[in-house]
């Protein structure tokens, strides 16, 4: 069953005719994703990659019945693109763009309340249900249909977890990059809740990092959840100094809050299995499942 997306998902691309939109749409089509068109204002009526181009998301949805959109738009315009997709009632919106101003995202976050849209990202690799639908910039070939749900704040560490769970034969049900910005659309808690309710997902890998309290919130949720599944977690930034941003905009220990130590302690107290090295994620999960 997987979560969020599957082979029936109809996907449009905002920023379709740009270099990033073109390249990653080609990759998605080659993977087998059901791409049905794209949006570039001023280029409506043309075709691109043998798909129709529309001026607005409203028009694209009306003509294609799209229920998902991926956004490859520069930071200054990305929030407006998300708002347009929300206004058009697109169900799943994946925003890849890094560097969107925080105040822009606060407006987006407010618009999401009570809407029909789930936003993944921004500043994320996207979402993939292996063998069915790839929305984002992740390398499709490392994925394998399987039983592990993966959710991560880091793109490249997601790929590590994917490659390792593929190598040990477990595969993935769905993989979600929630993004590394301080304000994002979907949290660890929301993703873990969906994975816990999904029959095909037998276990979960959660990859966090320093900054914020998303991992602590996830630990509280896991502790209180009536549904239990094996969960392995890796937290990046154990040696990170305070008050220094480490890559992602949200990866900063500020005011003594958001350290890896705090996150690890919270997750361990919730019964999550911790791996100290990203190289051991797949093996740790396999060993955990073999013990059950």
Curated annotation (Swiss-Prot):
Residues annotated for CoA binding in this entry: 17-20, 43, 96-98
Sites where the protein binds substrate: 159
Signal peptide from the UniProt entry: none
Pathway assigned to this chain's UniProt record: Carbohydrate metabolism; tricarboxylic acid cycle; succinate from succinyl-CoA (ligase route): step 1/1
UniProt entry keywords in alphabetical sequence: Ligase, Nucleotide-binding, Tricarboxylic acid cycle
Enzyme class per UniProt: ligase
GO cellular component: succinate-CoA ligase complex (ADP-forming)
Superkingdom field: Bacteria
UniProt EC number: 6.2.1.5
Residue numbers annotated as active site: 248
Keyword Manganese part of the UniProt annotation: no
Cited InterPro entries: Cit_synth/succinyl-CoA_lig_AS, Citrt_syn/SCS-alpha_CS, CoA-bd, CoA_lig_alpha, NAD(P)-bd_dom_sf, SUCC_ACL_C, Succinyl-CoA_synth-like
GO biological process: tricarboxylic acid cycle
Catalytic activity: succinate + ATP + CoA = succinyl-CoA + ADP + phosphate; GTP + succinate + CoA = succinyl-CoA + GDP + phosphate
GO molecular function, one term: succinate-CoA ligase (ADP-forming) activity
Pfam families: CoA_binding, Ligase_CoA
Xref: PANTHER family: SUCCINATE--COA LIGASE [ADP_GDP-FORMING] SUBUNIT ALPHA, MITOCHONDRIAL, SUCCINYL-COA LIGASE SUBUNIT ALPHA
Quaternary state and interactors: Heterotetramer of two alpha and two beta subunits.
Family: Belongs to the succinate/malate CoA ligase alpha subunit family.
Functional description taken from the UniProt entry: Succinyl-CoA synthetase functions in the citric acid cycle (TCA), coupling the hydrolysis of succinyl-CoA to the synthesis of either ATP or GTP and thus represents the only step of substrate-level phosphorylation in the TCA. The alpha subunit of the enzyme binds the substrates coenzyme A and phosphate, while succinate binding and nucleotide specificity is provided by the beta subunit.
HAMAP family, per database record: Succ_CoA_alpha
Record-given protein name: Succinate--CoA ligase [ADP-forming] subunit alpha
């Amino acid at each position: 069953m997987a979560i969020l997306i599957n082979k029936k998902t109809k996907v449009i691309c905002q920023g379709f005719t740009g270099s990033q939109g073109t390249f990653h749409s080609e990759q998605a089509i080659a993977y087998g994703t059901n791409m049905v068109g794209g949006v570039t204002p001023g280029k409506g009526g043309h075709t691109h990659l043998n798909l129709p181009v529309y001026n607005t998301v409203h028009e694209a949805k009306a003509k294609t019945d799209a229920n998902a959109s991926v956004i490859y738009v520069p930071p200054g315009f990305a929030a407006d693109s998300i708002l347009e997709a929300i206004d058009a009632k697109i169900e799943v919106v994946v925003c890849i763009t890094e560097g969107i101003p925080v105040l822009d995202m606060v407006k987006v976050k407010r618009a999401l309340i009570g809407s029909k849209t789930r936003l993944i990202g921004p500043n994320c690799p996207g979402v993939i249900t292996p063998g069915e639908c790839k929305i984002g910039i992740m390398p499709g070939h490392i994925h394998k249909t399987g039983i592990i749900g993966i959710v991560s704040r880091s793109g490249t560490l997601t790929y590590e977890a994917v490659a390792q769970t593929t190598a040990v034969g477990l595969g993935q049900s769905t993989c979600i990059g929630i993004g590394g910005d301080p304000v994002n659309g979907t949290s660890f808690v929301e993703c873990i809740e969906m994975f816990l309710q999904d029959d095909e997902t037998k276990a979960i890998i959660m990859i966090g990092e320093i900054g914020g309290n998303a991992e602590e919130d996830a630990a509280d949720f896991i502790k209180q959840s009536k549904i239990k599944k094996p969960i392995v977690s890796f937290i990046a930034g154990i040696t990170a100094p305070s008050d220094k941003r480490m890559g992602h905009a949200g990866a900063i220990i500020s005011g003594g809050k958001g350290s890896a130590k705090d996150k690890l302690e919270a997750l361990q107290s919730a019964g999550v299995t911790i791996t100290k090295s990203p190289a051991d994620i797949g093996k740790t999960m396999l060993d955990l499942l073999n013990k059950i």
